[in-house]
Amino acid sequence: MKAINIALDGPAAAGKSTIAKRVASELSMIYVDTGAMYRALTYKYLKLNKTEDFAKLVDQTTLDLTYKADKGQCVILDNEDVTDFLRNNDVTQHVSYVASKEPVRSFAVKKQKELAAEKGIVMDGRDIGTVVLPDADLKVYMIASVEERAERRYKDNQLRGIESNFEDLKRDIEARDQYDMNREISPLRKADDAVTLDTTGKTIEEVTDEILAMVSQIK
């Protein structure tokens, strides 16, 4: 198969990262978690007491992705591995706000485009098919019900030892959907040439197989 790029977009907790990792593994491609980039910048924003000088924040930031056999993708922020801090509730509650800021978006998109230049990339996020990789060979827009997405996030938090309330997670996801879809810069939307894939009630294996079947049709 020729080298291709795959873009997976969709709202929070639609299963993008889980599926992107699995697809990348099955196809021996490189997985790039763009959400982790925005989470890392949000982590720094919180460490800086919620600074509003986002241009200065990114100007004084180094951000790299590395891969370790035992952890997979790791996020190195200012020479520190911050991977284990990126899923805490405080970061989750602020990431949409930070990611909506133009300096932050420009900084991250530039890095994402650089990573995908050689192809062979599976990338997931909110604006991959519309902004980062508009020429991706396959674009999939993943959706799921709010209830299922909240349940996934709740179980994920449990595994990570993060305390959370199911109803609060539902409200947070609904609020984040509205924010992501209505922000001025790179709003969440389906690319015109993307395939919609509803993952509600489906297993990881079922969704992965559906995407692999789409890949097999690429000439």
UniProtKB/Swiss-Prot annotation:
It catalyses: CMP + ATP = CDP + ADP; dCMP + ATP = dCDP + ADP. It comes from the Bacteria. ATP binds at G10, P11, A12, A13, A14, G15, K16, S17, T18. InterPro entries: Cytidylate_kin (IPR003136), Cytidylate_kinase_dom (IPR011994), P-loop_NTPase (IPR027417). Keywords: ATP-binding, Cytoplasm, Kinase, Nucleotide-binding, Transferase. It is found in: Cytoplasm. GO terms for molecular function: ATP binding; CMP kinase activity; dCMP kinase activity. Gene3D superfamilies: P-loop containing nucleotide triphosphate hydrolases (3.40.50.300). One of its GO terms (biological process) is pyrimidine nucleotide metabolic process. Its EC number is 2.7.4.25. GO terms for cellular component: cytosol. Belongs to the cytidylate kinase family. Type 1 subfamily. This is Cytidylate kinase. It comes from Staphylococcus aureus (strain MRSA252). The lineage of its organism: Bacteria, Bacillati, Bacillota, Bacilli, Bacillales.
